[in-house]
Structure formats: structure tokens, C-alpha cells
Amino acid sequence: MKLTTRLAIVAALAMALPARPQEQPSQPGSQNAQSLDPAVTQKMAQGVLESMSAEHMHMNAHLKWTEARPQSAEAFRRAEEIVKVLRESIEKYKDYQAALADGFKIFLPHIPQPMYHFTNYRYGLEAETKFDPARPTSLLYKKTPDGYELIGAMYTATRFTTEDDLDKRVPLSVARWHAHVNICLPPRGQGQTPDLTRYGPTGSISTEDDCTAAGGRFLGQIFGWMVHIYPFEQTPEKVFAH
């Protein structure tokens, strides 16, 4: 699939959601991202992944969360069924070689990460229009001395999906979907030198005004909604941890 910017290619891999070419022009400044050095885009993508690890999944200016909804027996029943289907469908991927054989691809396998995303891009495309709990976009693994340990999965939806529709996929009273927002890309021409403590998905700049003042290019939201589920955990709090 053709993507319009190098950043989109790297970040789409990181986000486990293939970006549509027609969506890119709607992102302010996205076409100027072509000038970013590949090493910079890789570092920024790694920052996104690190921000999605369990220990970093908290409120900050670069993460937007769905509003929690009132709990109900029906929502909890639905959530339990999703977890059951997911657990059964990914059990075989405890052998990570089976995941690779079925088309899941590891993002940045040679760079240390708290959690690795094995992504099936066909499933990601399917998730743009429908939800199948047995076909998560990404599998989540921790690195071990002899391979990878399966710990969970990630579902995705487009950035245009409403909270009502997200709730129909995975109840918002039980889980909270998140999106990566308020990203300031470094100014053009900085090569490998931009200060990534200021720019990118973990940088201190998080408003369009501040980004413009710094000479950067502001993206209101990159890619779609995501939710992590850890179906092998023993309590609902850990199964839907964020």
C-alpha cells in the first residue's frame, strides 16, 4: 500500500494500523515529514511503542482516552466473551513462530522494547470496517532469553470511529481505548539532530501554537484508536490494564 510520507510508514508500523493514502493530506504538515532522517523517524516510532507499554500507559498530553462509561452486567458479559474468544484464538501464538507463519510481523525486532508488537496488516485493514475479536491487529510479546512470551493483543479502529462505535466493539465501561495525539514533528533540515525531548510522541511540545513557535509541524492525531487486552491475566483489572 502506498503511503505518502516516510514518517507514516514508520509510525504505521509502530501503531499497527496501516494508514490510508487519502487520510494523509488531512494531517497538517504530514507531507513535510519526508525530510526527516530515517534514524529520527525510527526513534520517534520507538517512542510511540514505549509510551504504549503498560508502565507508560497513563494520562499525558500525547494520549487521548475514551471516557469511561457506567458499568453494567451486559457490558461485563460482553467483555468476558471477547476475552474468552481472544484467549482461545491466540493460544497457539504462545509459540511466536506460529504467529510469524500466520503473517504477523515484528516491528523493530533488533531494538530493545518493553513490549513488542507482532502485527498482521490484513487484520488491521479488516478492522477498519468490522470488529472480529478472534483477529486482533497485533499480538503483544515480551522478549525472553530464548524468544518471545505472548502477553496480550491489540485491537484497532480508524481515527474516525466514534466512541459509541468503539463501545460496540469493546465496552468502554470495562476497557479504555486510546489514541496518540498532539505530535510536533521537528523542523525540516535537522537531520539526526532534533531534540526528541521536545519533539515527537514523547516530547514536551503538545500544542499547535507551541509547535508552530518552535518551527515544527503539528499533527493533531496520528492513526487510529487502539485498545490492549491481556487475556491470560487472572483479574479484570489486569486483563484490561492501561
Protein language model annotation of sequence segments:
Residues 19-23:
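Boundary at the C-terminal end of the N-terminal hydrophobic targeting segment
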Residues 8-16:
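Bacterial N-terminal signal peptides
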Residues 27-139, 143-242:
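Primary mode marks residue(s) on the alpha4-beta5-alpha5 output face of response regulator receiver
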Residues 1-8:
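Bacterial N-terminal signal peptides that target proteins for export
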